[in-house]
Amino acid sequence: KFLLGSHVWMNSEKLENNSKLRTVLKHGTLSIGFIGLAETLKALIGEHHGESAKAQKLGIEIVKHMREKCDEYCKEYNLNFTCLATPAEGLSGRFVAIDRSIYGKIKGVTDREYYTNSFHVPVYYKTSVKHKMEVEGKYHAFTNAGHISYIELDGDTVNNVDAFEQVVRIMHDSDIGYGAINHPVDRDPVCGYVGVIKDVCPRCGRREGEGVEMEKVNCYDCSNC
């Protein structure tokens, strides 16, 4: 409603109260998204795609079929249907709660508070960066409406640029269309320093639980102005 009412989409300024939307929708995309591939595979064969080649093969077949249906709809309706690897942070929790109320708690499927986003390997599954990217990279070509694969680093890469570059190259070699690298960022609530803080804040020298003189805090605040 916002996009149409604000005339963001081409030809939306010509719409009247009883107008059909085809003339406007044809300029945009109609994305069919999905979450929970990992849980789907657990329900079907007892393993997700990070655990076995058999599950990976089935997962690829499922997502490939979804993409093919989107392509069929494009030709049938002459509209831009696309397949979306959905990052549904809110929906993943809502859907699993609904399914649990209907089907009960199923191990590996509805026993957590969320479904895994899109085709991601579950975050609770211990694996290597290389394996995770190799598994997820197979799905990027099918999800033409958007996709993302990311890894979580447990340390600071500022002093280890080679490791950071290696991760990027692994993503490239795994056909990752859109990759992200998350790393920890701390914030000192007293002096406001943002970065990786180990035992001592590199700006004010404060340790966890210690205070700092107000004059120093004011000095830090002024330096950020």
Q: Where are the regions that the model predicts?
A:
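Long, C-terminal-biased catalytic regions of enzyme "large/alpha" subunits
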Residues: K1-C225
